[in-house]
From Swiss-Prot:
Principal location: membrane
Stated name of the protein: Inner membrane-spanning protein YciB
Known function: Plays a role in cell envelope biogenesis, maintenance of cell envelope integrity and membrane homeostasis.
Gene field: yciB
Protein family membership: Belongs to the YciB family.
């Protein structure tokens, strides 16, 4: 099935919308009501993404599954620990998958973003390693915040701190992307030249 590229504002809405719902409902009611609303918003965002683009990103699917599992545990057991652990689990999982892939000479960042960037193999490895470190650091940061700060502070950080930090980190990778960028035309020419040599 063909995928269509969503409008940047739509993509931003599906990513930030559930977090804003989580923050607003927590401020008006409590964390348990916010957890239920967050679960509904996550599912709604995935459905909207599929309806508009005919595709749901893998990271969104993984995040949605973890949210539903830990959100359900939070509501059933009436224990806010589970929903607070959710970001740690997600970030830790992403870090482990990216880092583990590098051990087997696989760059999962390249698999996800090869249509957006044309990098050399070395560039993809470095970028993957950096994102693995970033997710590991975010897992540690989440643990520190929810264990040492108030619930309201943690919710505020989750809603308005995580996205800016991620965007800043992503922007900081642009010099690396430019340094290891390879022009598709020159890459095709190189492949053609190698083919001619092998035929000769």
């Amino acid at each position: 099935m063909d995928k269509t590229q969503p409008h940047p504002l739509f993509k931003l809405a599906t990513e930030l919308g559930p977090l804003i719902v989580f923050f607003v409902v927590n401020a008006k009611f409590n964390l348990f009501a916010a957890t239920g609303a967050f679960m509904v918003a996550i599912v709604a965002a995935m459905i909207a993404s599929y309806v508009v683009t005919k595709h749901v990103p893998l990271m969104a699917i993984v995040t949605g599954i973890v949210v539903l599992v830990f959100g359900t545990l939070t509501l059933v057991l009436h224990d806010e620990t589970f929903i607070k652990l959710k970001p740690t689990i997600i970030y830790g999982l992403f870090a482990a998958v990216l880092g583990g892939g590098l051990l087997f000479n696989r760059s999962f960042i390249a698999i996800m973003f090869d249509q957006m960037f044309n990098l050399t193999p070395a560039g993809w490895r470095i970028l993957t390693f950096r994102w693995a470190l970033f997710f590991a650091a975010m897992a540690v940061l989440n643990e520190i915040i929810w264990r040492t700060q108030s619930t309201d502070f943690w919710v505020g950080f989750k809603a308005f701190g995580v996205v800016p930090l991620t965007m800043i980190f992503a922007i900081a990778q642009m010099p690396l992307i430019k340094r290891y960028h390879q022009d598709p035309a020159s890459l095709e020419a190189s492949d053609a030249a190698e083919g001619d040599v092998s035929k000769g």
